[in-house]
């Protein structure tokens, strides 16, 4: 699933191609995504130019004078910039053709993605209204995590993956951040100290920054706006390394299921 670094990579990649470019046509080949693609999408987009490409959590927001286009990539979706005369491939469900002769194309094999239209303020939309802070926002601190976790018995890994606490920390990056902070993923969130939460908040920012700089993580099917894979998988310290030696102590990395997700950690370095 594309997580925050992958979505941010795509945001940065498509921005120069779509900002201030008038939409000249919209083609919806498959409207049945996670939610139906609006039947009036063409009327909302054609003739208008996008004024920006923003990201909120794992949602892309493309505002124009009439409203805002919301795109979510779901489990396996990708956005690419292609010449407008490029024939569609399998699972190319939505095309947004631009006056430049380029097209923003959504490919989504599993159809868990979304293309929606927002007429009001995006921050008031049901999908966005209850999200926590961005991990790079000033309000995301160890003190905030400590305060929100008091009395919580759930695993700290599940706690930091809760989008109401902080957005964009998916399974891969949660495992990596907890390892760097030296915190066992199964430790109860309410039993993590203020000092260790400060280390975790910094580790989250460091891991996400490194992943964005590497263009995201390719495990199955993530590619950027030009179809290139992300390379952060080459820098993973624990995720996907079950049985391999810890890079710090040499003990084999373990994998356990936490909250129905595979979680990787070192039993010596993480407490």
Curated annotation (Swiss-Prot):
Keyword set, alphabetical order: DNA damage, DNA repair, DNA-binding, Glycosidase, Hydrolase, Lyase, Metal-binding, Multifunctional enzyme, Zinc, Zinc-finger
Keyword Amino-acid biosynthesis in annotation: no
Alphabetized GO MF terms: 8-oxo-7,8-dihydroguanine DNA N-glycosylase activity; class I DNA-(apurinic or apyrimidinic site) endonuclease activity; damaged DNA binding; zinc ion binding
InterPro entries given in the database record: DNA_glyclase/AP_lyase_DNA-bd (IPR015886), DNA_glyclase_Znf_dom_DNA_BS (IPR015887), Formamido-pyr_DNA_Glyclase (IPR020629), FPG_cat (IPR012319), MutM-like_N-ter (IPR035937), Ribosomal_uS13-like_H2TH (IPR010979), Znf_DNA_glyclase/AP_lyase (IPR000214), Znf_FPG/IleRS (IPR010663)
Domain of life the protein comes from: Bacteria
SUPFAM superfamilies: Glucocorticoid receptor-like (DNA-binding domain), N-terminal domain of MutM-like DNA repair proteins, S13-like H2TH domain
Keyword Transferase part of the UniProt annotation: no
Entry's cofactor comment: Binds 1 zinc ion per subunit.
Gene3D superfamilies linked to this entry: 1.10.8.50, MutM-like, N-terminal
Residues the entry annotates as binding DNA: 91, 110, 152
GO biological process, one term: base-excision repair
The protein's Enzyme Commission number: 3.2.2.23, 4.2.99.18
Cofactor: Zn(2+)
Zn-finger (FPG-type) residues: 237-271
Active site: 2-3, 58, 261
One of the Pfam families matching this protein, by short name: H2TH
Reactions listed under catalytic activity: Hydrolysis of DNA containing ring-opened 7-methylguanine residues, releasing 2,6-diamino-4-hydroxy-5-(N-methyl)formamidopyrimidine; 2'-deoxyribonucleotide-(2'-deoxyribose 5'-phosphate)-2'-deoxyribonucleotide-DNA = a 3'-end 2'-deoxyribonucleotide-(2,3-dehydro-2,3-deoxyribose 5'-phosphate)-DNA + a 5'-end 5'-phospho-2'-deoxyribonucleoside-DNA + H(+)
Function description: Involved in base excision repair of DNA damaged by oxidation or by mutagenic agents. Acts as a DNA glycosylase that recognizes and removes damaged bases. Has a preference for oxidized purines, such as 7,8-dihydro-8-oxoguanine (8-oxoG). Has AP (apurinic/apyrimidinic) lyase activity and introduces nicks in the DNA strand. Cleaves the DNA backbone by beta-delta elimination to generate a single-strand break at the site of the removed base with both 3'- and 5'-phosphates.
Summary of subunit composition and partner proteins: Monomer.
Family listed: Belongs to the FPG family.
Protein name, per record: Formamidopyrimidine-DNA glycosylase
UniProt source species: Syntrophotalea carbinolica (strain DSM 2380 / NBRC 103641 / GraBd1)
């Amino acid at each position: 699933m594309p997580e925050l670094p992958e979505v941010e990579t795509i945001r940065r990649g498509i921005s120069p191609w779509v900002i201030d470019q008038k939409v000249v046509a919209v083609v919806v080949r498959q409207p049945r995504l996670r939610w139906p693609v609006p039947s009036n999408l063409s009327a909302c987009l054609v003739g208008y130019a996008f004024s920006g490409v923003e990201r909120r959590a794992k949602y892309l927001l493309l505002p124009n004078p009439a409203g805002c286009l919301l795109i979510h990539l779901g489990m396996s979706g990708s956005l690419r910039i292609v010449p407008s005369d490029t024939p569609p491939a399998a699972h190319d469900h939505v095309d947004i053709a631009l006056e430049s002769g380029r097209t923003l194309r959504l490919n989504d094999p599993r159809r868990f993605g979304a293309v929606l239209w927002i007429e009001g303020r995006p921050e008031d939309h049901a999908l966005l209204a209850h999200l926590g802070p961005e991990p790079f926002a000033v309000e995301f601190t160890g003190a905030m995590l400590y305060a929100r976790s008091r009395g919580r018995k759930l695993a700290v890994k599940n706690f930091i993956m809760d989008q109401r606490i902080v957005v964009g920390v998916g399974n891969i990056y949660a495992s990596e951040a907890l390892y760097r902070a030296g915190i066992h993923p199964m430790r109860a969130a309410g039993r993590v100290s203020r000092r260790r939460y400060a280390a975790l908040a910094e580790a989250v920012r460091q891991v996400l920054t490194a992943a964005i700089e590497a263009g995201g993580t390719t495990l199955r099917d993530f590619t950027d706006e030009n179809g290139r894979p992300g390379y952060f998988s080459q820098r993973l310290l624990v995720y996907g390394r079950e049985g391999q030696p810890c890079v710090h102590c040499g003990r084999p990395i373990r994998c356990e299921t936490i909250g129905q997700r595979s979680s990787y950690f070192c039993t010596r370095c993480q407490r």
